[in-house]
Swiss-Prot record:
It comes from the Bacteria. Homodimer. Catalyzes the epimerization of 2-epi-5-epi-valiolone to 5-epi-valiolone. Involved in cetoniacytone A biosynthesis. One of its GO terms (biological process) is antibiotic biosynthetic process. InterPro entries: Glyas_Bleomycin-R_OHBP_Dase (IPR029068), Glyas_Fos-R_dOase_dom (IPR004360), MMCE/EMCE_epimerase (IPR051785), VOC (IPR037523). The keyword Transcription does not apply. It catalyses: 2-epi-5-epi-valiolone = 5-epi-valiolone. A divalent metal cation binds at H14, E76, H99, E151. This is 2-epi-5-epi-valiolone epimerase. It comes from Actinomyces sp. Its cofactor is a divalent metal cation. It holds the Pfam family Glyoxalase. One of its GO terms (molecular function) is methylmalonyl-CoA epimerase activity.
């Protein structure tokens, strides 16, 4: 084997989250966050397909939606019905804990907008990191009406970590609306 990584990998295609109510989540991500709905489908496979392919109960069913978030991110949402389903969201400190970070031009303005949205809970006030590898990063977490955590972030180019490595993090250009319909 030569090199590192998955042979032929060219990009991250999507991230996926399981939600308690697909309709509510799609509405939230399209109306509040600004995503675009690409498609929906229902997965109701016969036999042991769900177990073999998705490692869930064989009798599970799923409603699925794929959304586009800005110029480079696809977001897949699942609503499962399964007899052995756990119905508690992991905290960020739990194994499997997660959050989705959205780069915004103005964290304070975005947080204020979210505070006005029904059911959204902004977790404290935005703050700026003043030292370390990401000094200059301004951020705040928020929770959706069903409790999924997301983050607003603005990490300017030229962060201190860039002095130590050739690795550069993706830096968005323009607004999401600049990329509507782009592939």
């Amino acid at each position: 084997m030569t090199g590192r990584g998955i042979p032929g990998a060219v990009a991250v295609h999507h991230v996926a989250y399981t939600v308690p109510d697909l309709d509510q989540a799609v509405e939230f991500f399209t109306e509040v966050i600004g995503a675009e709905l690409a498609y929906t489908l229902v997965q109701d496979a016969a036999g042991d397909w769900m177990t073999r392919k998705l490692d869930v109960d064989a009798t599970a069913t799923a409603r699925i939606a794929m959304l586009r978030l800005g110029p480079v991110t696809n977001l897949e949402l699942f609503e499962y019905a399964a007899p052995d389903q756990r119905r508690q969201l992991p905290r960020n400190s739990d194994w499997g804990g997660h959050h989705l970070a959205i780069h915004v031009a103005d964290v304070d303005a975005a947080a204020e907008y979210l505070r006005a949205q029904p059911g959204v809970r902004v977790l404290g006030d935005p703050e700026t990191i003043t030292d370390g590898p990401i000094a200059g990063d301004r951020w705040v977490y928020f929770a959706t009406p069903w409790g999924m955590q997301l983050e607003l972030i603005n990490l300017p180019a030229g962060a201190p970590f860039e002095q130590q490595t050739e690795v550069r993090l993706y830096q968005p250009e323009g607004s999401w609306s600049d990329h509507r319909g782009a592939s």
